[in-house]
Curated annotation (Swiss-Prot):
This is Polyphosphate kinase. It comes from the Bacteria. It is an enzyme of class 2 (transferase). Keywords: ATP-binding, Kinase, Magnesium, Metal-binding, Nucleotide-binding, Phosphoprotein, Transferase. ATP binds at residues 63, 487, 583, 611.
């Protein structure tokens, strides 16, 4: 199922050398620029409520951890192997690692200055403060000593390091205390390590601990590692605690699976998850006050390069700040909103009846994800439904979708589910659901060898008037109601016969030995996504030569594929107007005269994570629009099962066109990519347009997306 096309999009006219490294942005540095934009949301004092700014610091920090676990780990492997191959922009692995360290160091400084210098004082003004244990009264310290003894002490494990005790294993993402001790009996110095338990909250809320009295109702917060460090004498009696120094470890967490050699994929992935714990250390976070002797000891025994040691003056592991979102201070958070539910409002909740009447397109989170959940629930209960087939990639830990599928099996339906076990960092969760589905009798498969199944597909077969009718859900996002509240994605419900035939054939390929490749409407990776996208770009060039008004609009999470970028450069050189909405990585450089001067790239970072993918071509006035799961990256085009599906109804095409135009008009949350590869906030003289806020306003007015007014395109 590989796309072996050898597109020659450069042959039509004489053009610059599109392999020139200056025409591309480094993938890793582009990702870091994206994470910088996430950090900027925390830095912006007037654009988010206070706790939401803290949330962005947490997201930035969590993103960066994952970046090191996967991308930096891969570069480290190349560097250690002496690889000198250059990236798309001409950099060696060593040069990329140097740039990453330089950028991350600067970002840490920005993040900590924002949190400690700006956000913490603002929290204090709202009655929330991080406090110093040493400032407490003796009576409060006594209460906390008892609290430590009963609630913290039992789950701590002090680990010594000496000739009789090997250096303790330090797990990935763990926060630890490196402790200097003096053995008073033998008058010698000792070293020990205590892991800060991840099973406990990282941030203690002192206002929730009985017996403490501070004389007011302020919310006082204490870092758990700080709290533990003040009670270490309970762990090491007859020892003098010299000092405790926090440190944090990030390990290589990529799982390499030789699927051709795997007897049982599920067991192989379980083994991979276990081995992930022992990946090499790719980042060591320490505080500046850690003595050189302890730092060198950690570097030696963790086998980490000194270039991968980062000094962080404040608390380590700020991804844990997400815990503060539990604080009940509505005035410090985004206002809640109720998404519209067009099916419920228009068809009284009978989803099959609604789909028979017309196709339905939902734009989450502004439109509720509940109709998708209701579709599976209704199918599970409906005696006329014979079978349900579905792909699952990331479904969450408490999934109503999976519960509905299990209920459908119990109701006698034939249920076939492709559970993608290789969904990174969701492997364990997906294994649990795969086994649960198997245990109730569902047909569970794990996909195709060598490919991740990332497509979002559901097919329901129902008996109607002595005939079988198929109903489809096709989406751009996961079957996860929790993320559907914070990710922007499309859901498409249809009973279109041609699409149903295509989806049926695709499920046969996924679950059986079908080698069907001739899909009539769907674009499927790794068969032909790159080929079809490039063909539509080339077609737009031909239309532009005839009519002079070629237009391409693409919205995606990442644009990395060199062949597609070259095709877009060719379109720009031919005069086609190209607008790209790329949330994250973008290796294409806009604004280069004679190459990309007709290309505009924006990235929208706001309250919701922009996750939908849309590919629009004017096509000489015969608009063509595809939605789906695929970004324009080699992994999506060559190594995953992805689906792009056409929107065939002209009214729904106009809906998406208007939404794309609104996003392109954003001058509040949009960042524009410059010709040097940097990003700057969109600044113009128009009235302020925050596209996500406009969509929220429309949802609050109970407007269906089918009523959105077309503006432009």
């Amino acid at each position: 199922m590989m796309d072996n096309s050898t597109e020659s999009v450069e042959d039509a006219v004489s053009l610059p050398d599109f392999d020139n490294p200056s025409f591309y942005v480094n993938r890793e540095l582009s990702w870091m620029a994206f994470n910088q934009r996430v950090l900027e949301e925390a830095l912006s004092r007037d654009e988010h409520p206070l706790l939401e700014r803290i949330k962005f610091i947490s997201i930035f920090s969590s993103n960066l951890d994952e970046f090191f676990m996967i991308r930096v780990a891969g570069l480290e492997d190349q560097y250690e192997a002496g690889v000198q191959d250059r990236s798309i922009d001409g950099m060696t692995p060593a040069e990329q690692l140097e740039k990453i360290r330089e950028g991350v160091t600067a970002q840490f400084i920005q993040r900590d200055a924002c949190f400690y210098g700006d956000i913490c004082p603002e929290l204090a003004r709202h009655g929330i403060e991080f406090v110093d244990y040493r400032s407490f009264s003796e009576s409060n310290k006594e209460v906390l000593q008892q609290y430590f003894r009963h609630e913290i002490f039992p789950v701590l494990t002090p680990l010594a390091f000496d000739t009789g005790h090997p250096f303790p294993f330090v797990s990935n993402l763990s926060l630890n205390l490196a402790i200097e001790l003096e053995d008073l009996e033998h008058q010698s110095m000792k070293f020990a390590r205590v892991k800060v338990p991840s099973i406990l909250p990282r941030i203690l809320r002192l206002d929730l601990i009985d017996g403490l009295d501070f004389g007011d109702d302020r919310i006082r917060l204490l870092w758990l590692d700080d709290f533990i460090s003040h009670h270490l004498e309970q762990l090491f009696p007859l020892m003098r605690i010299v000092q405790a120094y926090p440190f944090r470890v990030i390990r290589d967490a990529d799982i390499e699976i030789e699927e051709d050699e795997a007897g049982d994929l599920l067991e192989t992935i379980e083994q991979g998850i276990r081995s992930r714990r022992y990946g090499k250390v790719v980042r060591l976070d320490v505080t500046p006050d850690m003595p050189e002797s302890i730092r060198l000891l950690l570097i030696k025994h963790l086998e980490v390069s000194s270039r991968n040691v980062y000094e962080i003056p404040g608390a380590l592991g700020l991804s844990s700040l997400m815990e503060l979102m539990r604080i009940d201070k509505p005035e410090l958070k985004d206002e809640p909103f109720a998404p519209s539910n067009p099916i419920e409002e228009k068809a009284g909740g009978d989803i099959f009846s609604a789909i028979r009447q017309s196709d339905h397109l939902f734009y989450h989170p502004y439109d509720s994800f509940q109709p998708v959940v209701d579709l599976i629930n209704q199918a599970a209960r409906d005696p006329q439904v014979l079978s349900i087939k579905q792909t699952l990639y990331r479904v969450g830990s408490n999934s109503p979708i999976v519960q509905a599928l299990m209920h459908a099996v119990e109701e006698g339906k034939q249920v076939a589910v492709l559970v993608e076990l290789k969904a990174r960092f969701d492997e364990e969760n997906n294994i649990v659901w795969a086994r649960a589905l198997e245990n109730v009798g569902a047909h569970v498969v794990y996909g195709l060898v060598g490919l991740k199944t990332h497509a979002k597909l559901t097919m329901i077969v129902r008996r109607e008037h002595d005939k079988l009718k198929r109903y489809l859900h096709l989406g751009t996002g996961n079957y996860n109601p929790a993320t559907a509240k914070i990710y922007t994605d499309y859901s498409f419900l249809t009973a279109n016969e041609i699409l149903s035939e295509d989806v049926s054939e695709l499920f046969n390929a996924l679950t059986g030995y079908s080698r069907h490749t001739a899909y009539r409407k769907l674009i499927v990776s790794p068969l032909n996504t790159r080929k079809r996208i490039i063909a539509m770009i080339e077609r737009e060039i031909e239309w532009h030569k005839k009519e002079g008004n070629g237009r391409i609009v693409m919205k995606m999470n990442a644009l990395v594929d060199r062949k597609t970028i070259k095709a877009l450069y060719l379109a720009s050189a031919a005069g086609v107007q190209v607008d790209l909405i790329v949330r994250g990585i973008c290796c294409l450089v806009p604004g280069i005269e004679g190459v990309s001067h007709n290309i505009r790239v924006i990235s929208v970072i706001g309250r919701f994570l922009e996750h939908s993918r849309a590919y629009y071509f004017r096509n000489g006035g015969m608009d063509e629009l595809f939605l789906g799961s695929a970004d324009i990256m080699p992994r999506n085009l060559d190594h995953r099962v992805e689906v792009l599906f056409p929107v065939l109804d002209s009214e729904l095409i106009n809906v998406v066109k208007s939404e794309l135009e609104l996003i392109l008009s954003d001058n509040v949350k949009a960042w524009q990519m410059n010709a040097d590869g940097t990003y700057s906030k969109v600044v113009d003289q128009r009235p302020a347009v925050n596209s996500q806020s406009v969509f929220l306003q429309q949802a609050s007015m109970k407007k269906s997306i089918s009523k959105f007014k077309v503006n432009g395109l």
